[in-house]
């Protein structure tokens, strides 16, 4: 959340409003660049609670073959098999969640190294 908040503040300073933040569709061998659904939800909640009102009106979406889906579209979740099912416009979207064992947050100092 700290990284997103800092980047959003910098965009605001350049008069650029953040409208959407996308989590990319999972592809093979992409685990190093992904986050789990639980961590994504925690980041959304943290950013929304800490960002000023003019900054927290963005939408946080998961990319899917039929378009963007939000957590409000979550229809079913199986934590054992790490499987999520979203429904959008009557279409079912199966989404593999990243197991928590593979989900390790990056170092904030490393991610914001150029901001110092």
Where are these regions (language model features)?
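Catalytic cores of alpha/beta
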Residues: 1-11, 69-70
């Amino acid at each position: 959340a700290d990284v997103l908040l800092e980047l959003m503040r910098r965009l605001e300073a350049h008069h650029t409003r953040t409208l959407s933040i996308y989590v990319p569709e999972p592809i093979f061998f992409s685990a190093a660049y992904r986050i789990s659904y639980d961590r994504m939800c925690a980041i959304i909640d943290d950013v929304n609670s800490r960002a000023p009102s003019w900054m927290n009106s963005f939408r946080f979406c998961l990319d899917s073959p039929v378009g963007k889906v939000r957590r409000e579209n979550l229809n079913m979740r199986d934590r054992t098999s790490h499987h999520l099912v979203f429904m959008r416009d009557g279409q079912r979207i199966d989404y593999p969640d990243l197991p928590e064992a593979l989900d390790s947050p990056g170092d904030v100092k490393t991610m914001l190294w150029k901001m110092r």
